[in-house]
């Protein structure tokens, strides 16, 4: 039988985990009515059998990490931007540490449109920490039920009445006792570097063996959080990544920090949305007025394995003896960078799909000419066909796509028609299934006053719960006494 010491050493003192069988992202980013958010659990475990943890504070932060590499810019070709989008004090109360309300002098922390603001007092749960430090005889594991739904019904106004965005969520858990109450909040501020916690106040530290702290970070309705993205095209690299960082402050020792990557997706650019499947008609006359071209684009959003298709109609206007030489269809990728040393944006473009049809100087009669052009996406004729991006916009860069139709004529000016098109990372079959899931989620949010996802309990094993020198071990991530 494995000894308890061996079992304990397999655990990290601080871990961030998603809910069982789920991802960190709940709801659908880009669809505000689905109440998108990040949910999970921060687990704290003591690795010493006879020494509980002397905790001062546990915080959780959501970071966005952007990076851009532009080879042709020389020594200043690399740009990066790291931002803390949200900071939540999980333990103890946020109000017991007012210094955390002071923004640090650090450019990495910025109050941007993506920052998740602190909830109004009227929507804040009460949380009591005095019970964690009491020496009264209590059960070895304390559970605090979460009884308040995380967001109010969508039809209710913001309780704060403020013009500044306030997330419609009640933070995370509710604990009620006869003691005084304080607020738990989310703030875009945080301590950048680990510090030595040297407080001698006995009420500022809490001796515990283990804790399970559920968290829930809502996404703002009035801001766009881009998808996780990474693209390397001909040496030009742009990426957006996210990670959760948990910091545990202990008495007299450096902070312990753990990070976990988080993959975020947006669902407002699915190719199955009806707004992207209405035909778009474009009419253009050649610069000499001799030919009229009409183009019909059946769908304005494409995904992997989709067929990019257009219908082209060419009619003579006031010319004769006009011949059509070639029709072509192209999809061009535009990567736009915002560089501090450049007065204008830097644009890199590359064709990612091309289809040509030679008509061998076909005569344009009075009845005109109609053709259909189509090709699967991505185009396997390109060497980097396996490198596919999608439409996205971030702080340092944006990736957009343009559909280009060219008509090459003889005895008339050539015509070129361009129209923006959205490229989605999701296949159309999967997109349709996601629409059904989104609809179900939105109905759940409306009917359950927020579609509660986080139903976990706060679980705390305090040092005072072991009156004797009992040994303990972990079983299925729960601490248990050994007989």
UniProtKB/Swiss-Prot annotation:
GO CC field: cell division site; cytoplasm; cytosol; division septum
Gene3D superfamilies according to UniProt: 2.60.40.640
Biased composition (Low complexity): 171-187
UniProt region (Disordered), positions on chain: 134-197
GO biological processes: division septum assembly; mitotic division septum assembly
Residue spans crossing the bilayer: none
Localization per record: Cytoplasm
Main location (coarse class): cytoplasm
One Pfam match: Arrestin_C
Disulfide bonds: none
Keywords from the named record: Cytoplasm
GO molecular function, one term: protein-membrane adaptor activity
Homology family: Belongs to the arrestin family.
Function: Involved in cytokinesis.
The protein's name: Arrestin family protein 1
Classification of source organism: Eukaryota, Fungi, Dikarya, Ascomycota, Taphrinomycotina
